[in-house]
Protein backbone atom coordinates (compact mmCIF):
# COMPACT_ATOMS: atom_id res chain seq x y z
CA UNK A 1 0.00 0.00 0.00
CA UNK A 2 2.74 2.45 0.98
CA UNK A 3 4.73 1.52 -2.14
CA UNK A 4 1.73 2.29 -4.37
CA UNK A 5 1.23 5.66 -2.68
CA UNK A 6 4.95 6.53 -3.05
CA UNK A 7 5.00 5.53 -6.73
CA UNK A 8 1.89 7.63 -7.40
CA UNK A 9 3.49 10.65 -5.67
CA UNK A 10 6.67 10.26 -7.75
CA UNK A 11 4.56 9.99 -10.93
CA UNK A 12 2.66 13.20 -10.12
CA UNK A 13 5.83 15.14 -9.29
CA UNK A 14 7.67 13.95 -12.40
CA UNK A 15 4.71 14.60 -14.70
CA UNK A 16 4.51 18.19 -13.38
CA UNK A 17 8.22 18.69 -14.06
CA UNK A 18 9.08 19.32 -10.41
CA UNK A 19 11.97 16.85 -10.24
CA UNK A 20 13.33 17.90 -13.61
CA UNK A 21 13.39 21.57 -12.57
CA UNK A 22 15.01 20.76 -9.23
CA UNK A 23 17.58 18.50 -10.86
CA UNK A 24 18.44 21.15 -13.46
CA UNK A 25 18.73 23.88 -10.80
CA UNK A 26 21.03 21.78 -8.63
CA UNK A 27 23.15 20.69 -11.58
CA UNK A 28 23.51 24.33 -12.65
CA UNK A 29 24.66 25.42 -9.19
CA UNK A 30 27.19 22.59 -9.01
CA UNK A 31 28.43 23.38 -12.53
CA UNK A 32 29.00 27.06 -11.74
CA UNK A 33 30.79 26.17 -8.51
CA UNK A 34 33.09 23.78 -10.37
CA UNK A 35 33.86 26.37 -13.02
CA UNK A 36 34.72 29.00 -10.44
CA UNK A 37 36.93 26.65 -8.47
CA UNK A 38 38.72 25.34 -11.57
CA UNK A 39 40.92 28.40 -12.04
CA UNK A 40 44.58 27.47 -12.26
CA UNK A 41 47.02 28.64 -9.60
CA UNK A 42 50.81 28.77 -9.57
CA UNK A 43 53.42 29.74 -6.93
CA UNK A 44 53.42 33.51 -6.55
CA UNK A 45 56.22 35.95 -5.75
CA UNK A 46 55.89 38.26 -2.76
CA UNK A 47 54.00 41.53 -3.08
CA UNK A 48 57.29 43.39 -2.67
CA UNK A 49 58.95 41.48 -5.53
CA UNK A 50 55.91 42.01 -7.72
CA UNK A 51 55.81 45.74 -7.00
CA UNK A 52 59.56 46.08 -7.66
CA UNK A 53 59.16 44.38 -11.05
CA UNK A 54 56.27 46.74 -11.84
CA UNK A 55 58.64 49.71 -11.59
CA UNK A 56 59.99 48.65 -15.01
CA UNK A 57 63.57 49.70 -14.29
CA UNK A 58 66.08 49.45 -17.12
CA UNK A 59 68.29 46.38 -16.79
CA UNK A 60 72.06 46.65 -16.39
CA UNK A 61 74.31 47.11 -19.42
CA UNK A 62 74.53 43.95 -21.52
CA UNK A 63 71.16 42.69 -20.28
CA UNK A 64 67.52 43.02 -21.29
CA UNK A 65 64.41 42.74 -19.17
CA UNK A 66 61.76 40.27 -20.31
CA UNK A 67 58.18 40.39 -19.08
CA UNK A 68 55.89 37.53 -20.08
CA UNK A 69 52.29 37.88 -19.02
CA UNK A 70 48.90 36.22 -19.42
CA UNK A 71 45.73 38.27 -19.17
CA UNK A 72 43.28 36.45 -21.44
CA UNK A 73 39.89 35.30 -20.19
CA UNK A 74 39.85 32.09 -22.22
CA UNK A 75 41.41 29.06 -20.56
CA UNK A 76 41.24 30.15 -16.93
CA UNK A 77 41.63 26.53 -15.75
CA UNK A 78 44.74 25.91 -17.86
CA UNK A 79 48.35 26.18 -16.79
CA UNK A 80 50.91 26.40 -19.60
CA UNK A 81 54.67 25.88 -19.35
CA UNK A 82 56.94 28.74 -20.43
CA UNK A 83 60.52 28.52 -21.68
CA UNK A 84 63.30 30.95 -22.55
CA UNK A 85 65.86 29.38 -24.89
CA UNK A 86 64.46 25.93 -24.04
CA UNK A 87 64.95 26.48 -20.28
CA UNK A 88 61.80 26.09 -18.17
CA UNK A 89 60.91 29.28 -16.29
CA UNK A 90 57.52 28.31 -14.86
CA UNK A 91 53.87 27.55 -15.42
CA UNK A 92 51.64 30.43 -16.36
CA UNK A 93 48.15 30.91 -15.05
CA UNK A 94 45.54 33.61 -15.61
CA UNK A 95 46.40 37.12 -14.44
CA UNK A 96 50.10 36.51 -13.74
CA UNK A 97 53.39 37.70 -15.17
CA UNK A 98 57.01 36.60 -15.10
CA UNK A 99 60.07 38.85 -15.14
CA UNK A 100 63.51 37.61 -16.16
CA UNK A 101 66.78 39.42 -16.84
CA UNK A 102 68.41 37.95 -19.96
CA UNK A 103 71.58 38.67 -21.94
CA UNK A 104 70.94 41.05 -24.83
CA UNK A 105 70.71 39.24 -28.16
CA UNK A 106 68.53 36.67 -29.89
CA UNK A 107 66.23 34.48 -27.83
CA UNK A 108 63.50 31.90 -28.33
CA UNK A 109 60.47 32.26 -26.07
CA UNK A 110 58.21 29.18 -26.03
CA UNK A 111 54.92 28.15 -24.51
CA UNK A 112 53.29 24.78 -24.20
CA UNK A 113 50.36 24.53 -26.60
CA UNK A 114 47.93 21.80 -27.55
CA UNK A 115 50.18 19.47 -29.58
CA UNK A 116 53.63 21.09 -29.46
CA UNK A 117 55.30 24.26 -28.21
CA UNK A 118 54.58 27.61 -29.84
CA UNK A 119 57.75 29.67 -30.31
CA UNK A 120 58.46 33.39 -30.64
CA UNK A 121 61.94 34.54 -31.67
CA UNK A 122 62.99 38.00 -30.51
CA UNK A 123 66.14 40.09 -30.65
CA UNK A 124 66.74 42.20 -27.55
CA UNK A 125 68.96 45.21 -27.00
CA UNK A 126 71.00 46.05 -23.93
CA UNK A 127 69.23 48.16 -21.30
CA UNK A 128 65.70 47.71 -22.70
CA UNK A 129 62.60 45.89 -21.46
CA UNK A 130 60.52 43.64 -23.71
CA UNK A 131 56.94 42.53 -23.25
CA UNK A 132 55.47 39.22 -24.42
CA UNK A 133 51.79 38.40 -24.08
CA UNK A 134 50.81 34.77 -23.74
CA UNK A 135 47.26 34.09 -24.81
CA UNK A 136 45.19 30.94 -24.73
CA UNK A 137 42.94 29.81 -27.54
CA UNK A 138 40.42 27.09 -28.18
CA UNK A 139 41.87 23.77 -29.29
CA UNK A 140 40.69 20.45 -30.63
CA UNK A 141 41.12 18.53 -27.36
CA UNK A 142 42.44 21.10 -24.87
CA UNK A 143 43.15 24.80 -25.11
CA UNK A 144 46.29 25.87 -26.89
CA UNK A 145 48.53 28.86 -26.25
CA UNK A 146 50.57 31.29 -28.28
CA UNK A 147 52.86 34.29 -27.75
CA UNK A 148 53.00 37.78 -29.21
CA UNK A 149 55.34 40.68 -28.61
CA UNK A 150 53.48 43.83 -27.57
CA UNK A 151 54.47 47.46 -27.21
CA UNK A 152 56.02 48.73 -24.00
CA UNK A 153 52.93 50.86 -23.35
CA UNK A 154 50.53 47.93 -23.77
CA UNK A 155 52.71 45.62 -21.69
CA UNK A 156 53.10 48.03 -18.79
CA UNK A 157 49.37 48.74 -18.73
CA UNK A 158 48.49 45.03 -18.59
CA UNK A 159 51.18 44.06 -16.07
CA UNK A 160 50.19 46.84 -13.67
CA UNK A 161 46.97 44.86 -13.00
CA UNK A 162 48.64 41.45 -12.60
CA UNK A 163 50.68 39.62 -9.94
CA UNK A 164 54.13 38.13 -10.44
CA UNK A 165 54.63 34.36 -10.43
CA UNK A 166 57.76 32.68 -9.13
CA UNK A 167 60.13 31.81 -11.96
CA UNK A 168 62.81 29.11 -12.03
Curated annotation (Swiss-Prot):
Looking at the UniProt entry, the stretches that span the membrane are 23-47
Main subcellular localisation: membrane
Taxonomically, which superkingdom? Answer: Bacteria
Per the record, membrane topology reads: Single-pass membrane protein
Subcellular localization is given as: Membrane
Q: What keywords appear on the UniProt entry?
A: Membrane, Transmembrane, Transmembrane helix
**Pfam families, per this entry?**
DUF2846
GO cellular-component terms in the record?
membrane
- The protein here is known as Uncharacterized protein HI_1456
Amino acid sequence: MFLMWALRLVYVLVSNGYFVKQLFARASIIGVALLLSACATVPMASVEESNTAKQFRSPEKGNSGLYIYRDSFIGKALKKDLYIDDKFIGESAPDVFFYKTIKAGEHKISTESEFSNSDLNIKTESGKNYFIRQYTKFGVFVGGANLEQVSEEEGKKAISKLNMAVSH
